[in-house]
Amino acid sequence: MHRFDFRRLRRWELALAAFALSTPFLLPALAPVSSSLVSPAMAETVEKPDTSRIVSIGGAVTEIIYALGEENRLVGRDSTSTYPEAAAKLPNVGYMRQLAPEGIIAVNPAAIVAIEGSGPPEALSVLKQANIPFTTIGETYDEAGILAKIRAVGAFLGVPDKAEALVKSVEQDLDTALADSAARRESERKRVLFILSTQDGKIMASGTGTAASGIIELAGAVNAAGKFPGYKPLTDEAIVEAKPDVILMMDRGGAHGMSADQLFALPALSLTPAAKSKALVRMDGLHLLGFGPRTASAIRELNTAIYGKKTNASQ
């Protein structure tokens, strides 16, 4: 049985008190945490931590830990960590961008490993003040970023040999998937609009520098709204001008989200090429946007959903 560290608790209580005083003035944010709290390196920590009991923040990070066969160290995970199914049995410490320190402290972790962009900054500050080793894993939305992420998690866990074996397997799979996407001629590439949400009829879409933009490009398509960074609401005029051939969304399951008929009934979308062919693709969010070990599978699935069949070069 692991005893709770009461010396750590006292440090945490002081830090949490400061956090509680600041929270009334916090606003939820879609943006990543401040760069002062996230190292550009793929793994940043103050010292080599004890990783016998870890909380994993970020679906791809958790997935990598399982792929490395080191899941026995996990004592908690965030709400985006939905794969593999076994991860759902772990205590859920909340959404990666809206973490509450007390939920993480409650599972008594020896260390925390989190994907870049986790937050809010005030919560991360509380966790660091509680003297819990905190490691950030960097994020880029390309093949190199996926492989670096695996190596960084392997280094954090102290299993670099396992990480290199996984890198080799994932790299081969990615190279095959990317070769198929690259074989498609530029003139044949379809324009894809990723829609994050349609709240109150407002289309929140992906521009550049996002996981959505990255996976669209890796699948051999064009980001139809690639003229701005991050996510933002689009005007009706901007949607019509984007001329998407395909609409891409996360599959939220059940009755959540609009049906294809409801979506394409929205005035701006009704005027797009995608509406004429009812071209709507929904995929599991972590699989599509996680940029973890299964990304090659996501590339193939999205490529097939967009184009219907493989290119001649891959047949």
For each of these PLM feature ranges, what is it?
Residues 206-231, 251, 281:
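His/Asp/Glu-enriched short active-site or ligand-binding loop at hydrolase and phosphoryl-transfer sites
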Residues 3-29, 35:
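Bacterial N-terminal signal peptides that target proteins for export
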Residues 118-129, 246-264:
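A ligand-binding cleft/hinge motif common to bilobed small-molecule-binding domains
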Residues 101-108, 130, 235-243:
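Short helices/loops that flank or line small-molecule/ion binding pockets
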Residues 48-53, 122-200, 223-227, 278-315:
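Extracytoplasmic substrate-binding proteins
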